[in-house]
Amino acid sequence: MLQPKRTKFRKAFKGQINGQSKGGFTLSFGQFGLKALEPERVTARQIEATRRAITREMKRQGKVWIRVFPDVPVTAKPIEVRMGKGKGGVDRWVARVAPGRILFEIDGVPEDIARQALALGAAKLPIKTKVVKRIEGI
């Protein structure tokens, strides 16, 4: 599971995801990518499940790049605990994903396999996505 090795602070505010992605909206490595169309917090488990689905469909050919990293801690209190008494412990790690953000990139496989793999991966995510292709010469 992805998570930071160390952080400046143990716990974070909930925060908001406003507007379009300020960076990471172009393909940097592969020929095909999976682009987010909605704002959402994506957990480390969802990222890993997506990576596995994509890799399995590609039959371990080609290369996969994960372009998001879960660096925000989400806290939760134990079950049946009364309100108050401080903030709960870190429960999971999430990545804040804004619309337009490239989540995954792949290369080294034919277009039909790439689109199928990314579609299977997209089914593991809680947001609407679309498959994008690199345009040469721009």
UniProtKB/Swiss-Prot annotation:
Pfam families: Ribosomal_L16 (PF00252). PROSITE patterns: RIBOSOMAL_L16_1, RIBOSOMAL_L16_2. GO terms for biological process: translation. It comes from the Bacteria. Keywords: Ribonucleoprotein, Ribosomal protein, RNA-binding, rRNA-binding, tRNA-binding. GO terms for molecular function: rRNA binding; structural constituent of ribosome; tRNA binding. The keyword rRNA-binding applies. Belongs to the universal ribosomal protein uL16 family. NCBIfam families: rplP_bact. Part of the 50S ribosomal subunit. This is Large ribosomal subunit protein uL16. It comes from Hyphomonas neptunium (strain ATCC 15444). The gene is rplP.
